[in-house]
């Protein structure tokens, strides 16, 4: 059934829809299956994503038609399809009237992903009008809160050197806490790896007191504050809350130094919102394990990593992993810096839409996946700043001297970039950074050919 007369209006102007402030706009790359016209398929897609079904139904009235989603732009050659969704379509909380990401996802990327006439459809950007921005929670904490704890300026406080406890699984409580202590002697921030929680060989009620003790010892020894991101992800919201409450009790007066890590993709949006609302005084660390199933460029359905990051800010994530922008082991390109810019700035023009955030707190880009001191200067140069959290697991624990030396080398890499120094020359005066060359010789050979001869007299 051709529904283009009802669910498409190509005379609509995007600038008018934005100025009106009554629609959420979504940009897709969509391809129909063979034998289906582009506009016909696009209109069917909009119908399935809003008020329509596969036949005309007698219960439809004029009000219903007033909240139809409308295709307003198509370009078959580039697979471009843009749809305007009336704000009234989206579900609201009965408790406080606020919007929810689950409703957004249900409509814009729900049943339409299994339609028989669609080869593929993937969201690459969306626009939220001012009223929608007001109706999402947004972050309660941001990187400025971390800088404040670390004793830094709350504006441009700079790089937070972090790690992930490695190996990701298999450490019992005492070795786990010792690994944390060793890194904290040189670094700022430690996070649980996403599978770490309450394994039988490392129960949380034994691990967390030891980690707090390690934190206190490291703070006493270095005179610096330390930060820990504890994984509270669970299937059950009550279990997640119980974990969070236990951790806060355990850390006691140092609870402000604890972030809560939630695996937001596998756990779902409800886990992020529950953590945001139950623990507004904690930094909310959004881990995105599994996201590549839909965000990878090789995946033709779902949504891009840019879209995931943008949604995370609406939900209230204080920080989210954004990959390594082609500088680490994770899939990505240098242009992925746009993922960082959309969540950290108050205004940004993305691949399809300009988005204003109207003062919503920023979400911190968290950099992780194959990064070490040698890769960081180029990363910072591409991003244009160092106001990020970086969690380097192998980059710290793989340092030839010690995890503390690995942490120090990460800090020195940031200082090298800030000073606009040549990394080889910088290494001659910074021993931990210099030893990173020997620790990661494959990277050193790739990034700094001839480094062995240049550093030979400074070993």
UniProtKB/Swiss-Prot annotation:
Binds 1 Mg(2+) ion per subunit. Belongs to the RuBisCO large chain family. Type II subfamily. The record marks 329 as: Transition state stabilizer. Signal peptide: none annotated. The active site is at 166 (proton acceptor), 287 (proton acceptor). The basic functional RuBisCO is composed of a large chain homodimer in a 'head-to-tail' conformation. In contrast to form I RuBisCO, the form II RuBisCO are composed solely of large subunits. GO terms for molecular function: magnesium ion binding; monooxygenase activity; ribulose-bisphosphate carboxylase activity. It holds the Pfam family RuBisCO_large_N. This is Ribulose bisphosphate carboxylase. HAMAP family: RuBisCO_L_type2. Its EC number is 4.1.1.39. SUPFAM superfamilies: RuBisCo, C-terminal domain, RuBisCO, large subunit, small (N-terminal) domain. Keywords: Calvin cycle, Carbon dioxide fixation, Lyase, Magnesium, Metal-binding, Monooxygenase, Oxidoreductase. RuBisCO catalyzes two reactions: the carboxylation of D-ribulose 1,5-bisphosphate, the primary event in carbon dioxide fixation, as well as the oxidative fragmentation of the pentose substrate. Both reactions occur simultaneously and in competition at the same active site. Mg(2+) binds at residues 191, 193-194. Substrate binds at residues 111, 168, 288, 321, 368. Its cofactor is Mg(2+). Homodimer. It catalyses: 2 (2R)-3-phosphoglycerate + 2 H(+) = D-ribulose 1,5-bisphosphate + CO2 + H2O; D-ribulose 1,5-bisphosphate + O2 = 2-phosphoglycolate + (2R)-3-phosphoglycerate + 2 H(+). The modification N6-carboxylysine is found at residue 191. GO terms for biological process: reductive pentose-phosphate cycle. It comes from the Bacteria.
């Amino acid at each position: 059934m051709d529904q283009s007369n009802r669910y498409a209006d190509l005379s609509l102007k995007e600038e008018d829809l934005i100025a009106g402030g009554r629609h959420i706009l979504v940009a897709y790359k969509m391809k129909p299956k063979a034998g289906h016209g582009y506009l016909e398929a696009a209109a069917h897609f909009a119908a399935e994503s809003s008020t329509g079904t596969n036949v005309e139904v007698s219960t439809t009235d004029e009000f219903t038609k007033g909240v139809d989603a409308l295709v307003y732009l198509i370009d078959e050659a580039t697979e471009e399809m843009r749809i305007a969704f009336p704000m009234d379509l989206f579900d609201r909380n009965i408790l406080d009237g606020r919007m929810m990401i689950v409703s957004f996802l249900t409509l814009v990327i729900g049943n339409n992903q299994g339609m028989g006439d669609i080869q593929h459809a993937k969201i690459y950007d969306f626009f939220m009008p001012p009223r929608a921005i007001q109706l999402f929670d947004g972050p309660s904490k941001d990187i400025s809160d971390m800088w404040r704890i670390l004793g830094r300026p709350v504006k441009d406080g700079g790089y937070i050197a972090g790690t992930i406890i490695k190996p990701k699984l298999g450490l019992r409580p005492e070795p786990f806490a010792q690994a944390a202590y060793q890194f904290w002697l040189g670094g700022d921030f430690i996070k649980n790896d996403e599978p770490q929680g309450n394994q039988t060989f490392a129960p949380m009620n034994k691990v967390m007191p030891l980690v707090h003790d390690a934190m206190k010892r490291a703070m006493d020894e270095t005179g610096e504050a330390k930060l820990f991101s504890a994984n509270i992800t669970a299937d059950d919201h009550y279990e997640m809350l119980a974990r969070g409450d236990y951790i806060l009790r355990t850390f006691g007066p140092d609870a402000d130094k604890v972030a809560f890590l939630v695996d937001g993709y596998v756990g779902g949006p409800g886990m992020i919102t529950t953590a945001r609302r139950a623990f507004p005084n904690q930094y909310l660390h959004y881990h995105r394990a599994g996201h590549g199933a839909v965000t990878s460029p090789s995946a033709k359905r779902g949504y891009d990593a840019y879209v995931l990051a943008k949604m995370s800010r609406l939900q209230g994530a204080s920080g989210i992993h954004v990959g390594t922008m082609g500088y680490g082991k994770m899939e990505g390109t240098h242009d992925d810096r746009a993922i960082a810019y959309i969540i950290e700035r108050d205004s940004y023009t993305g691949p399809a839409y300009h988005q204003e955030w109207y003062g919503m707190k920023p979400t911190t880009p968290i950099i992780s996946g194959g990064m070490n001191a040698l890769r960081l200067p180029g990363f910072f140069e591409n991003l244009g700043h160092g106001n990020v959290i970086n969690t380097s697991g192998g980059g710290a624990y793989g340092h030839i001297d010690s995890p503390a030396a690995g942490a120090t080398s990460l800090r020195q890499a940031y200082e090298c970039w800030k000073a606009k120094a040549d990394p080889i020359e910088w290494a001659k005066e910074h021993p931990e950074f210099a030893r990173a060359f020997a620790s990661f010789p494959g990277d050193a050979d790739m990034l700094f050919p001839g480094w062995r001869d240049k550093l030979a007299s400074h070993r």
